[in-house]
């Protein structure tokens, strides 16, 4: 642990805490200061000037990053008949119905994304206590409750990410891995920022993005100038 603390201190020393970096500078610096022994995830953190207690100021959705996330998602689909066949053909890792509910209730969680056709939500609803806290519950807002199973599976496999503001207005989204070229991470970052900016509620007055930073797994945060996009 002491070694990690020393590495973190060394990384922090390379960052000017009083400076707002451009997108390109921030991403490059986040990569440079990553000290994990594995291919760390690069994550963007927003603090938004919104009141999530109000229904018209909730920020939630999904998007496909242009360069993916560097992780191949394991996709589970709740569907029957032709839609189950469609899900399998699209590349879903697991497809089924009640038998999957029993398996998940038994403690199995070897998947990253859950998709369901609307008619299956009564079945999936029985898993609310398991999937809900893990942000795995299918939702129309993220495109995971849909009849277009092919599109949902393909987007999940291509690098789809979900974003959602917490009670404090914070949004955390992965944009790739440290091993990515800086240009690809910047492109993903800019694509994400366009979506977050476009989601600004009409009721949000004043500065919308109050704090923005990029970091890596276990690494220090680098503040980003939101005006540099």
From Swiss-Prot:
One of its GO terms (cellular component) is large ribosomal subunit. GO terms for biological process: regulation of translation; translation. Keywords: Repressor, Ribonucleoprotein, Ribosomal protein, RNA-binding, rRNA-binding, Translation regulation, tRNA-binding. One of its GO terms (molecular function) is rRNA binding. The keyword Ribosomal protein applies. Pfam families: Ribosomal_L1. The keyword Transcription regulation does not apply. InterPro entries: Ribosom_uL1_bac-type, Ribosomal_uL1, Ribosomal_uL1-like, Ribosomal_uL1/biogenesis, Ribosomal_uL1_3-a/b-sand, Ribosomal_uL1_CS. Binds directly to 23S rRNA. The L1 stalk is quite mobile in the ribosome, and is involved in E site tRNA release. Belongs to the universal ribosomal protein uL1 family. HAMAP family: Ribosomal_uL1_B. Part of the 50S ribosomal subunit. PANTHER family: 54S RIBOSOMAL PROTEIN L1, MITOCHONDRIAL, LARGE RIBOSOMAL SUBUNIT PROTEIN UL1M. This is Large ribosomal subunit protein uL1. It comes from Lactococcus lactis subsp. lactis (strain IL1403) (Streptococcus lactis). The lineage of its organism: Bacteria, Bacillati, Bacillota, Bacilli, Lactobacillales.
């Amino acid at each position: 642990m002491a070694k990690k603390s020393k590495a973190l201190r060394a990384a922090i020393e390379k960052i000017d805490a009083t400076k707002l970096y451009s997108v390109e500078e921030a991403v490059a610096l986040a990569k440079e200061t990553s000290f994990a022994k594995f291919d760390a995830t690069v994550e963007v953190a927003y603090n938004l000037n919104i009141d999530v207690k109000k229904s018209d100021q909730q920020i939630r959705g999904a998007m496909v990053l242009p360069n993916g996330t560097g992780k191949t998602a394991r996709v589970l689909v709740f569907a029957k008949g032709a839609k189950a066949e469609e899900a399998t053909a699209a590349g879903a890792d697991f497809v089924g119905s009640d038998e999957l509910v029993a398996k998940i209730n038994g403690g199995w969680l070897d998947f990253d994304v859950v998709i369901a056709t609307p008619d299956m939500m009564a079945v999936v609803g029985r898993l609310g206590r398991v999937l809900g806290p893990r942000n795995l519950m299918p939702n129309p807002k993220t495109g995971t409750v849909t009849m277009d199973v092919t599109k949902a599976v393909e987007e999940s496999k291509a690098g789809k990410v979900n974003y959602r503001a917490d009670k404090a207005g914070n949004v955390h989204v992965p944009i790739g891995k440290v091993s990515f070229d800086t240009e690809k991470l910047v492109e993903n970052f800019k694509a994400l920022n366009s979506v977050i900016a476009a989601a600004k509620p009409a009721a949000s007055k004043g500065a919308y993005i109050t704090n923005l930073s990029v970091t890596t797994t276990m690494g220090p945060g680098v503040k980003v100038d939101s005006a540099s996009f």
